[in-house]
Amino acid sequence: MASYKFKTQNSFLLLLSISFFFLLLLNKVNSTGSLSFSFPKFAPNQPYLIFQRDALVTSTGVLQLTNVVNGVPSRKSLGRALYAAPFQIWDSTTGNVASFVTSFSFIIQAPNPATTADGLAFFLAPVDTQPLDLGGMLGIFKNGYFNKSNQIVAVEFDTFSNRHWDPTGRHMGINVNSIVSVKTVPWNWANGEVANVFISYEASTKSLTASLVYPSLETSFIIHAIVDVKDVLPEWVRFGFSATTGIDTGYVQTNDVLSWSFESNLPGGNSVASVKNAGLSTYAA
């Protein structure tokens, strides 16, 4: 497993390659088993999302996952936002698996940069998924150990190092059925800066890749793992974001998502709960 920190030129090449794959998927979205949506910003009382616990959309169109009171983040906060329509990640009849690309931008800001906690994650889970434990479990796990019944795949952006399962320092991680990541890379979190994230899953190679770019700082981070989603996830899933703040006093941060898009293709799929047949429409500002 190689991890990299890129400067300007390599950041551009990384984004170019991810964008190319994104465009390949766009060319396929008219096939039967496809799902596509874009939120350039969010709307208050957003009908296309399921909000859990503290998550809400602000009057300025920001998806605020964890609680903020008078401009100050709250401790012991947990919030999740899921796309409203279930998503067929694989087809039990054909055995085919969906490829997908998702991109989103977020800001994590902390009153005290030395005491951040706990993090934000993009995840896929069973359709009936509910918020789980606070703090280091990021709202998506009940305990820190591998359990195949969890049926969860996540990419985490972890701002607090839990000594029982995390590497030292802030990091990105890929999680499969456990808060103990199968892969991690160091992440130089930038307080209050916009982070652009690109996550792709290529079904033919079972390759899950995530990159994070800070345009203002000209730095990027990338992580990759082989994940067989057909072995890990149920045929139908929900997906979205989860975030938590710390348990202890002072260990807090904002967890704000600014925009989000998603494209997928399931070859030969014939029953995908797409935006249209879920009774929803793609939202645009």
Curated annotation (Swiss-Prot):
Ca(2+) binds at residues 158, 162, 166. Pfam families: Lectin_legB (PF00139). Expressed in seed. Keywords: Calcium, Glycoprotein, Lectin, Manganese, Metal-binding, Signal. GO terms for molecular function: carbohydrate binding; metal ion binding. This is Seed agglutinin 2. Glycans are attached at residue 147. It comes from the Eukaryota. Mn(2+) binds at residues 156, 158, 166, 171. InterPro entries: ConA-like_dom_sf, L-lectin, Lectin_LegA_CS, Lectin_legB_Mn/Ca_BS, Legume_lectin_dom, Leguminous_Lectin. It comes from Robinia pseudoacacia (Black locust). The keyword Manganese applies. Residues 1-31 form the signal peptide. SUPFAM superfamilies: Concanavalin A-like lectins/glucanases.
